[in-house]
Curated annotation (Swiss-Prot):
It comes from Mus musculus (Mouse). It comes from the Eukaryota. This is E3 ubiquitin-protein ligase TRIM62. Its main location: cytoplasm. A zinc finger (B box-type) spans 88-128.
Length: 475
């Protein structure tokens, strides 16, 4: 056992593990330093003996014990507590039938005699029972971590499967929506084409009928004119003066109805009606059937911060650097945020509008709950009733989520499109110049929504002085 082994490795003089062990002729072992100091103290007596058996030596020789030194070295390579705590109940070594230890560092069973101690020097070595408890605890922790990971992966897979099904369903629905939108345009174009061709045929028939009637009338008149000319030619061919003059009296009667003035009048065929900016003409006729048409929104002056200046038609807002306007405060008016709401509140339907943001370095646009707070400093985020995107730091764009979501905008925006499908809970922002997508809010809107505008503060150095302007499409 470990305790018995330790006793065998103790010097009987210093009661510590042998240091540089040597043997005497009586085969007792001591530390070289210990036995040397013992004999120094005996020099006055003139005799030197063994502290164990008291055998005296005239000229003692100290023989190094290499085997014992190796055993001490192997023993010292293992932590003392691990050796003392090793139990006889541990699985025996087949070669030595000795207690086994366990190296926690290498995760391996150890035999004191079989395994090289130097290989496990500075390792964490313990007894079988302690190792069992320690590894049981570690493995239970790992099992719990794996079970947690299994649950998280299962939930993630369930979510991905739902998203997969929803994406397939959404794609199918969107294919239908896109198909219906284009089919409606195709149908409208076909209807306009049919109507225009029918109108062309009607104009053609009317013009041709008029021309044909005039051709018939002028043909009849031409024959009479030719008959009159022939009568006159025959009379002029008469050389006998008496005969010529005798027929003059009846000549006027014969020429009656033979002479007609042309006075030809006609209308040009209306080709300009079917040429010119034909596509623009067709687009204008289709515009009334396009849905949604960019809404002609206006801003509500009663909600505007006193630093904001609105145009007479309430479609343009700018930050004023002069003193605040002497406006009457009310619960509707923003008192800290330089903002203004739209006049119209949305509670259903599909709507679209555009805002011109060119040459600005700061702005916020989007939607706000009609009941959202307008007093004090406001956090522009969905939990506060605001669904907006923002331009900040001169050239950065973000969605006002929690936290903000940076938008991938390649070129500076000049015009932003805002699309609201209230019933579907969709608010989508576009680059209105090419209708490229910017960001989508998906929400269950709890009440009426108003368009939201903030031009940001302008600066004395001329930055951000341009206004925000609602883009009104005029046809």
């Amino acid at each position: 056992m470990a305790c018995s082994l330790k006793d065998e490795l103790l010097c009987s003089i210093c009661l510590s593990i042998y240091q540089d062990p040597v043997s005497l002729g009586c085969e007792h072992y001591f530390c070289r330093r210990c036995i040397t100091e013992h004999w120094v103290r005996q020099e006055a007596q003139g005799a030197r003996d063994c502290p164990e058996c008291r055998r005296t030596f005239a000229e003692p020789a100290l023989a190094p014990s290499l085997k014992l030194a190796n055993i001490v070295e192997r023993y010292s390579a293992f932590p003392l507590d691990a050796i003392l705590n090793a139990r006889r109940a541990a699985r025996p070594c087949q070669a030595h039938d000795k207690v086994k230890l366990f190296c926690l560092t290498d995760r391996a069973l150890l035999c004191f005699f079989c395994d090289e101690p130097a290989l496990h020097e500075q390792h964490q070595v313990t007894g079988i029972d302690d190792a069992f408890e320690e590894l049981q605890r570690e493995l239970k922790e790992q099992l719990q971590a794996l079970q947690d990971s299994e649950r998280e992966h299962t939930e993630a897979l369930q979510l991905l499967k739902r998203q997969l099904a929803e994406t397939k369903s959404s794609t199918k629905s969107l294919r239908t929506t896109i198909g219906e939108a284009f089919e409606r345009l195709h149908r409208l174009l076909r209807e306009r084409q049919k109507a225009m061709l029918e109108e062309l045929e009607a104009d053609t028939a009317r013009t041709l009928t008029d021309i044909e009637q005039k051709v018939q009338r002028y043909s009849q008149q031409l024959r009479k004119v030719q008959e009159g000319a022939q009568i006159l030619q025959e009379r002029l061919a008469e050389t006998d003066r008496h005969t010529f003059l005798a027929g003059v009296a009846s000549l006027s009667e014969r020429l009656k109805g033979k002479i007609h003035e042309t006075n030809l009048t006609y209308e040009d065929f209306p080709t300009s009606k079917y040429t010119g900016p034909l596509q623009y003409t067709i687009w204008k006729s289709l515009f009334q059937d396009i849905h949604p048409v960019p809404a002609a929104l206006t801003m509500d002056p009663g909600t505007a911060h006193q630093r904001l200046i609105l145009s007479d038609d309430c479609t343009i807002v700018a930050y004023g650097n002069l003193h605040p306007q002497p406006l009457q405060d009310s619960p509707k008016r923003f008192d800290v945020e330089v903002s203004v709401l739209g006049s119209e509140a949305f509670s259903s339907g599909v709507h679209y509008w555009e805002v011109v943001v060119a040459e600005k370095t700061q702005w916020v646009i989007g939607l706000a709950h009609e009941a959202a707070s307008r007093k004090g400093s406001i956090q522009i985020q969905p939990s506060r009733g605001f669904y907006c995107i923002v331009m900040h730091d001169g050239n950065q764009y973000s969605a006002c989520t929690e936290p903000w979501t940076r938008l991938n905008v390649r070129d500076k925006l000049d015009k932003v499109g805002v699309f609201l499908d209230y019933d579907q809970g969709l608010l989508i922002f576009y680059n209105a110049d090419d209708m490229s997508w910017l960001y989508t809010f998906r929400e269950k809107f709890p009440g009426k929504l108003c368009s939201y505008f903030s031009p940001g503060q302008s600066h004395a150095n001329g930055k951000n002085v341009q206004p925000l302007r609602i883009n009104t499409v005029r046809i």
